[in-house]
Amino acid sequence: MAILYYDEKKLFQLNTENTTYVIGLSPEGYVGHVYYGPLLHGEPDLYPLRMDEPPFTPSVNKREKSSFLDRFPMEYPTGGVGDYRESCLNIRNAQGRMGCEIFFDSYEIFKGKRPLTGLPASFGTEDEVETLEITCKDPVLDLVVVLSYSVFTKENVITRSVRVKNEGSEALKVEKIYSACLDMDNEDFEMLSLHGSWGRERHIQQGALRYGKQLVSSGKGESSHQEHPFVALVTPGTDQERGEVYAMHFVYSGNFIGQVERCQFDTVRMVMGINQEEFCWNLKAGDEFQAPEVVMVYSAEGLGKMTRSYHAFYRRHMIRSPYNHKKRPILINNWEATYFDFDTDKLLDIAREAKKDGIEMLVMDDGWFGKRNKDDSSLGEWVVNE
């Protein structure tokens, strides 16, 4: 089984072929992050969720040290409860008060993966993927938060998503909802992201992780040439074959944020989701909201292993084309050959030569309409230029 639950220790263990992800439950019911890294053989332990309280701790529970939420490694941190690092979920009630505190309620482990309502998402058969859903509740807001983890064993991928449901009688405002969080001790991590512009996309930007917050985001309604919804943490000296990589990629083409925060206790929090800028969702009584999916990969063999994991995963579990696993038809486009200067005879010559090489379709590009002989006229005049 890819997903195991140890009832006595209150631990969930998610295994791929080469990696392990461990989630633990504190005595108070907080859902905490225990481990993500190379495959573990045998049962993990809960001790990473215990820590000493530093001075000036706003603790409300003298019995357990995990009550200090500003240092607790949360699986899904919420705003307004004493964790002053970046939150993943901010809820405002009908009276205008902001705050949400969720506690473990139940879990379900099942083979396969359910679709995400209204969203693009990965898929797989019951033999290819196994899913853990952890249900948490805020008893004050009557809010249900379901944390979903799908384990694609062969590809060494774990996908995450979140959905919330208002089970109360009053509407709630969702002011922020991210899809994933990863809390870890700092290992001199460097942050890697991708930037660019038109014609020069996906340039690697990598640098030391400073105290405070570093991010990549888009607030213009799309991911783009300039910003890509991908963030990775890498250990120093990481190259294509060596080094540890913790990566997140967002399956969403709208506003997004990928952020890494190094806090005062030298822990690191990486989050990803819908950009909270220009976002607010009115969650009426009985309504649900489904957040998009994040694809997580861990590699102990550098960026090359990470890249191959993503490539294999997207080919097998994201692309729904009937040509996914067979050769695709080939087409040719006349633009680079002719620019605006073409007529019927030129196009037929291109088509005849292309057919000799097995090309099955000719696409006629810019210049066929209006008096479109240069790029400063006739755009939008949908009349054939003969």
Positions of PLM-derived features:
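Short loop/turn motifs at secondary-structure junctions
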Residues: 158, 173, 290, 357-358, ...
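Terminal connector regions
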Residues: 152, 293-329
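Conserved mixed alpha/beta catalytic, RNA-binding, or beta-rich assembly cores of soluble enzyme
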Residues: 260-263, 274, 301
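Polysaccharide-binding surfaces and accessory modules of carbohydrate-active proteins
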Residues: 10-13, 17, 31-261, 277
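Aromatic-lined carbohydrate-binding/catalytic grooves of carbohydrate-active enzymes
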Residues: 323-386
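Short acidic, Pro/Gly- and aromatic-enriched capping/linker segments at domain boundaries
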Residues: 1-12, 267-284
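Short Pro-Gly-centered flexible turn/kink motifs
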Residues: 92, 97-105, 281-300
